[in-house]
Amino acid sequence: MEQCACVERELDKVLHKFLTYGQHCEQSLEELLHSVGQLRAELASAALQGTPLSATLSLVMSQCCRKIRDTVQKLASDHKDIHSSVSRVGKAIDRNFDSEICGVVSDAVWDSREKQQQILQMAIVEHLYQQGMLSVAEELCQESTLNVDLDFKQPFLELNRILEALHEQDLGPALEWAVSHRQRLLELNSSLEFKLHRLHFIRLLAGGPEKQLEALSYARHFQPFARLHQREIQVMMGSLVYLRLGLEKSPYCHLLDNSHWAEICETFTRDACSLLGLSVESPLSVSFASGCVALPVLMNIKAVIEQRQCTGVWSHKDELPIEIELGMKCWYHSVFACPILRQQTSDSNPPIKLICGHVISRDALNKLINGGKLKCPYCPMEQNPADGKRIIF
């Protein structure tokens, strides 16, 4: 963090100089334009009158030319000073950060350089599609000769089409999508469809008393959601009482908050990605964020290993010598290790919950069976092995 702070201080200085230079440059040029404009008007007036150029006007022209030359030289000098400040940022980065990080990961991690390049290009393309930068993704595919199937693109195209409509406060495409995927959204316990109907109802409320009948008619869409969202529906129906007086000055003014649009975009993105089998954040974003957390630790480990000359500790290409805590945000799958066999469970050897509540792996359960009965290794309870239930975390 200290290294980042040092670089940030240099960046702040550069940004301040950019701002100051821009303001000074704009002011100086405006003054020059004003002076030249006045001089031009005087010259035009003298030409119309047919009078020769006076000594005073000649002096003014000389002073104006000198002022232009001095201003240009001053701006050029200030511009050079900015270049030196930018160079200091680069030096601060070199001084505070280790530029050589290739040694942290062995080349043996990748099957080949071509495979490495292909995986990276695919990760970048997927990130661009997910961010809605479709034209950039297509351009990268053409330049890298990367073949991307239409089936891969289609979910991203649909997702971004609906998100663009939501950013323009158009609920139509999102509502159509939610209705067509209603059953699968219910299986996810999603409230997306209700939130979309609620937002449409709020838009009608914002239309004032003229939209009251239309809002009452639209409220019939809430009927399927009455059991799960009764309180929220009551609040919205109660707001109709204040419609003629104006919701802005009523206890229901929070309904008009623009944050509802940001919330609906987040909800749609999360639920749609879950439904389409996509992650909310692209693999590139997750890898980059994880790398920012893990890289300093890996650099320290590498330095210690080299200092103590114990390179054999880090010999596996798919395993680190120590566990690195990346934070809850990077936890995607719960992991259970069997306390009996001290092995991580898997699809072929899943965790099994016994009647007594203790959990062991299936392999451990099979090894503990004696005479058709199973005695829990942690308590005196004896039970039928068939009574064990598989657990899915």
Curated annotation (Swiss-Prot):
CDD domains named in the record: dRING_RMD5B
UniProt-annotated location(s): Cytoplasm, Cytosol
Chain positions found as N-acetylmethionine: M1
CTLH domain sequence ranges: 155-212
Domain LisH: 116-148
GO cellular component, one term: cytosol
Major site of localization recorded for this protein: cytoplasm
Matches recorded under SMART domains: CRA (SM00757), CTLH (SM00668), LisH (SM00667)
Catalyzed reactions: S-ubiquitinyl-[E2 ubiquitin-conjugating enzyme]-L-cysteine + [acceptor protein]-L-lysine = [E2 ubiquitin-conjugating enzyme]-L-cysteine + N(6)-ubiquitinyl-[acceptor protein]-L-lysine
A molecular-function term among this protein's GO annotations: zinc ion binding
UniProt KW Hydrolase keyword: no
GO annotation terms (biological process): proteasome-mediated ubiquitin-dependent protein catabolic process
EC annotation from Swiss-Prot or TrEMBL: 2.3.2.27
Annotated keywords: Acetylation, Cytoplasm, Metal-binding, Transferase, Ubl conjugation pathway, Zinc, Zinc-finger
RING-Gid-type zinc finger locations on the chain: 338-379
Function recorded in the entry: Core component of the CTLH E3 ubiquitin-protein ligase complex that selectively accepts ubiquitin from UBE2H and mediates ubiquitination and subsequent proteasomal degradation of the transcription factor HBP1. MAEA and RMND5A are both required for catalytic activity of the CTLH E3 ubiquitin-protein ligase complex. Catalytic activity of the complex is required for normal cell proliferation. The CTLH E3 ubiquitin-protein ligase complex is not required for the degradation of enzymes involved in gluconeogenesis, such as FBP1.
Complex formation: Identified in the CTLH complex that contains GID4, RANBP9 and/or RANBP10, MKLN1, MAEA, RMND5A (or alternatively its paralog RMND5B), GID8, ARMC8, WDR26 and YPEL5. Within this complex, MAEA, RMND5A (or alternatively its paralog RMND5B), GID8, WDR26, and RANBP9 and/or RANBP10 form the catalytic core, while GID4, MKLN1, ARMC8 and YPEL5 have ancillary roles.
This protein's name: E3 ubiquitin-protein transferase RMND5B
Native organism: Mus musculus (Mouse)
Lineage of the species this protein comes from: Eukaryota, Metazoa, Chordata, Craniata, Vertebrata
Gene name tied to this protein: Rmnd5b
